[in-house]
Amino acid sequence: MAQHAEWNHEQAHLDETLQIVKNEREKAEADLGIVGGNDRMIQVIDDGSDDALVAQFVTRMKLRGLHQLRLSEKQPYFARLDFTPDAGAPVFGDLKPGVNSATYIGRWGVLQTPEYRVRVADWRSPVANLYYSGQVGRVSYEAPDGRVEGELTLKRMFTIGQGRLEGMQDTGLVGQEKFLTEALSQVTTARLREVVTTIQAEQNTVIRYDPMLPLCVQGVAGSGKTTIALHRIAWILYRLQKTVAPQQLLILAPNPLFLSYISRVLPDLGVNEVRQTTFAGLCQRLMGKRMPKLSQSARLSERLLMNKPARDALDDVLKRKGALSLRGQISRFLTEWEKSCIPGQDVKLGERVLISTEELRRFYLTDFRHFPLEVRVGEVRKVVVTRLKKAVEAASERLERTVEERLDALLRSMPDGPERRARARKLFDARDERLAQMKERQKTFLKEYDALWGSMDLLAVYAAFWRDMAARDAANLPVLEATLPALAKKRAVPEDLPALLLLASGLYGLKRTDIKHVVIDEAQDVSPLQVNALREVFRHDAFTLVGDLCQGIYGDEGLRSWEDIGQGIFGQSPEVARLSTAYRSTVEIMEVAFSVMGRHPVLGAGIAKPVLRHGKKPTLAVAATDRDRVAGIIRTVQGWLREGYAGIAVIAKTEKAARALHQAVVREIPQARHVTQGDDCFEGGVQVMDASLVKGLEFDCVAVSDADALTYPDERFYAKLFYVLCTRPLHRLKFACVGEPARHLENAPVERENEEGR
């Protein structure tokens, strides 16, 4: 292939840019006092003062900039735009109205000091939007000072490795797709990849959507939902860098393993300080010591062991626990509980009324109404304690006066002697005993007073809530029966958390939080009530929810439609953006996935369009015995390893089956690892795992080890699960079974292997 006509010019520009980056890196190291690249020598005095805090912040910012410069030394940019802004247009960097200028786009912006000239524009900058969404010709983009219109005359893409120009091409749509296909053909590592250089137009729209408005992203499997959500966070931090810190953005993921999977890409995007947790982890932080212990319920694993009637019954319970309508019921119940907790009698000390029922109600329901319930009880208690102290002090003073009067009478009536002294001692002893009794009575009085109020124990109130719901509607009785056993053990299950969070907010209040944008991944498995609870906790509409309705394998606990959260939660209905292009898997793999979901279509999920990247047909091996089945799987995995594939998943339906399979696989492939529900680190390599763990992950190759009709019945639930399994691999997909293959593969374009699985 002939070398590009401007190759030498671009190599010279790259060399010049790399020298500038090196100079800026050396300046940054000198500014920080770094010698020999040893960042550990940096020390900032921390004496708790405001000056020390400012110094720490400035140092962190400088270190972040230094890290970005070091990364830029390997690849300072990946694209070039030649753009001529119209006359009078607001401009960025070196752009001038009416002048055709070249702008280089990189993962990080590079400023040349001391004049602070933009040598490389950050991919998140407004002008970089032209790279992702513009084609040569008339274009425009939104800048802080207004809309910029003009003529885009060139889009050029570069491949740069370790500071050397390895490839370049001037792109229209065709060239860009070729560049994307080459990037997707690479072998995976044990981590999610950043895709700054290959963001597509539909993804770019999602990334740059208004950060203050709610957004739902319906993305087909392999459309880059998670990756794009992380890039959206990076863009938000760039866009709102003056008002939002990384710690004020939150990623909610389904489990610790998934968090491990995504966490390694965050430093590449400069967002490693963003908070990441699960919903349970967030509840722990918000509720503190009020957070109940959770039963370690592997819900999907349990569902996989159920028959359809049992699964349907569980789905009904989950649906009721996660329904948005439950929010109104919780509010109603708290109002009723609020009133039922008030003592129905005057609070007396002996015959003296310390606080009347009417006063209790006024303090509790009116004066302290702005406090949560338990805080109100505490505030009323302060009033009672104050009055109790005054009453005891008054009684003590009366007792002292009485003793003084009796002592005075004794002194006047009797001469000094043993008898008078004995009577005086008796008088003082009686006084001291009475004072001790009064002090002890204070303690017992307060215990008795506290017992007059209704319970504020979270799990007790939650149990009372479902008893109330069951009494109002017998259809809620199964929910009560399913909930009480765990509560009796002072535990809850994950699906209880949204309601518990709302109850805790009303009962005690929650710890304050300054989160300004929330990203919820795998949002199809989040209940409407959970979204509502999060909205109430954070008190803003800055939410990004990404998911795929086709992968909703947690039954009715999750969303059946994005319309489930379309009304009644946010200030305005969320925009629903669709990512319909599947980038992960080859055309041949996606054709199998389409066939699987075609048997049980999901309303509103959309139809996936695979990138035109071809590979080998998925295979189906029907073995005569289990031994043949496992042996065939092992041979296949060994073949994949010889071909150089790094990320391989061997999937069994259940954890028990995965454990047994791993025991067989590891004898022939020692590096094979058994991944379980409790693992919180995604390491890559050959991994044997059960079907409940793979959603959201991707691999080079996947072997579904038990793809028979008995293991995966022809039901909607199993169709969704099978679809998830089919859409995990980038390059290779194999099904193995003994007996009749799953009906999900009945019309799927798979290549049959012989019964020995060779």
Predicted regions and their residues:
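P-loop NTPase Walker
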Residues: 1-15, 20-24, 28, 74, ...
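Extended, charged low-complexity regulatory segments
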Residues: 1-196, 200, 204-205, 743, ...
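Conserved P-loop NTPase-based nucleic-acid remodeling module centered on helicase motor cores
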Residues: 89-131, 271-338, 688-690, 701-704
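A positively charged, amphipathic N-terminal helix/segment that binds anionic biomolecules
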Residues: 158-160, 230, 341, 345
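Well-ordered alpha-helical segments embedded in enzymatic catalytic cores
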Residues: 198-206, 232, 329, 502, ...
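Hydrophobic, well-ordered secondary-structure scaffolds
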Residues: 220, 227-241, 250-251, 493-520, ...
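Conserved helicase motor core of SF1/SF2 NTP-dependent helicases
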Residues: 242, 256, 260-272, 277-281, ...
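Conserved helicase NTPase catalytic core signature
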Residues: 336-517, 530-531
